[in-house]
Regions:
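Phosphate- and divalent-cation-binding pockets in alpha/beta enzyme and binding domains
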Residues: 17, 92, 114
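Structural beta-alpha unit
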Residues: 1, 24, 71-105, 142-153
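Small/aliphatic-rich secondary-structure junction motif
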Residues: 1-49, 153
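Short, solvent-exposed amphipathic alpha-helices that sit
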Residues: 21, 58-69, 92
Length: 153
């Protein structure tokens, strides 16, 4: 069914929700490979290449986080890779899905975050309008976060 699943992670407890679903899904799809992406969208991340900047401490932490998740997935028998991108999250996720030949994007949604989502919309909402890759959205809230985290804190 699916061969390569792109999983955007946010470096929050919500990630455990989608990762639990993706583990099950990848297992039923002949161990589909999993591509993790975190899109840093701070000023440094958006301008790192244009201004030849070094990774910020936040970006280093994000890289360590997604690499730890990839290592955990690999220990469980999945083929996994981690990508740290910078820029507009929806656009970077959509571009990564095409570049990495992913046939599914699986991500969490967690409802509106106040006025900012009303004004600019959520990443999930924007992504579904700009990608041709199917998107699986799983609603997550602190109540649905699994008891045992995927990556030790």
């Amino acid at each position: 069914m699916y061969e390569r699943i792109l999983v955007p992670v946010e470096h929050t407890p919500y990630d455990d929700v989608i990762l639990a679903h993706v583990r099950k899904l990848a297992s039923t799809c002949n161990n589909a490979s999993i591509v993790l992406i975190h899109v840093a969208d701070g000023w440094a991340a958006r301008n790192i290449n244009a201004l030849n900047l070094r990774e910020s401490e936040e970006m280093k932490s994000d890289r360590e986080y997604i690499e730890a998740i990839a290592d955990s997935l690999e220990k469980d028998g999945f083929e996994a890779e981690a990508i740290l991108a910078g820029g507009d999250p929806a656009k970077e996720i959509a571009a990564c899905a095409v570049r990495e030949n992913c046939d599914l994007i699986a991500m969490t949604t967690h409802g509106h975050h106040g006025i900012s989502d009303v004004i600019r919309g959520s990443v999930a909402s924007e992504l579904r309008h700009i990608t041709m890759v199917p998107v699986l959205m799983v609603r997550a809230s602190p109540r649905t976060t699994p008891a045992s985290p995927t990556v030790p804190s």
